[in-house]
């Protein structure tokens, strides 16, 4: 079974809506249209028909972006939380945007022509919703790195991962992803492994005082057991 890294699922953010900030809710008709498109995409998504789900959901993402722009929303919660709820559907936006990220990555693994879309989505999310939950932002930064790696910009991918641990030094997932980049285990990254570099990164994460050290300790234990069959090491 593949150990390919999947983003940790996060709850919603706690964006603060200042006094006097009132956001107009969507009309029942608009709300229904967005919810209907979201549910339509879950049909292929649940059958692992990733590209088909993305074809339905990417236009929906653009529609949500218009709502986000027009109402000055800065974090995921701004759509669904508080007295002035903007959107309400069968599936929470907070869950759906993570499912779209998952669908895009899986579509790109199967068909690399999707990687530019993955890159666009991950960057757009962080630009438009910078006050979201920290784990959401870490996940999107890692997704951006995955996309850069997927289109052959490996050096930029690592720079993105390194910036992420600087910005989120206590995030075990930020450190884990950077170490995974070099581990050679089946986490979906390209390039030859440098297991000593991976080990050093995991250990730096532990020294930084990450919130859940077990994530990194498990990876260090895996490295200690030796490379997986077929792992290509970087020549010394």
Regions found by a protein language model. Give the residues of each.
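Amphipathic alpha-helical repeat scaffolds of TPR domains
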Residues: 29-46, 58, 87-109, 123, ...
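Eukaryote-biased recognition of C-terminal alpha-helical segments
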Residues: 134-151, 155-156, 162-164, 219-232
């Amino acid at each position: 079974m593949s150990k390919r890294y999947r983003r940790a699922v996060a709850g919603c953010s706690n964006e603060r809506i200042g006094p006097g900030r009132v956001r107009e809710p969507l009309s029942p008709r608009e709300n229904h249209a967005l919810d209907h498109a979201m549910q339509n995409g879950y049909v292929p998504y649940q059958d692992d028909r990733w590209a088909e789900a993305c074809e339905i959901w990417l236009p929906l993402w653009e529609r949500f972006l218009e709502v986000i722009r027009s109402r000055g929303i800065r974090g995921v919660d701004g759509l669904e939380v508080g007295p002035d709820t903007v959107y309400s559907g069968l599936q929470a936006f907070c869950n759906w945007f993570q499912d779209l990220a998952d669908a895009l990555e899986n579509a790109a693994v199967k068909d690399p022509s999707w990687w530019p879309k993955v890159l666009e989505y991950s960057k757009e999310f962080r630009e438009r919703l910078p006050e979201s939950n920290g784990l959401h932002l870490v996940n999107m930064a890692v997704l951006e790195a995955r996309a850069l790696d997927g289109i052959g910009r490996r050096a930029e991918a690592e720079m993105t991962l390194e910036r992420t641990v600087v910005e989120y030094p206590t995030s075990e997932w930020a450190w884990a992803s950077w170490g995974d980049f070099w581990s050679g285990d089946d986490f979906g990254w390209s390039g030859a492994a440098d297991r000593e570099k991976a080990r050093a990164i995991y250990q730096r994460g532990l020294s930084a005082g990450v919130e859940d050290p077990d994530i990194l300790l498990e990876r260090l234990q895996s490295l200690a057991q030796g490379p997986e069959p077929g792992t290509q090491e970087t020549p010394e």
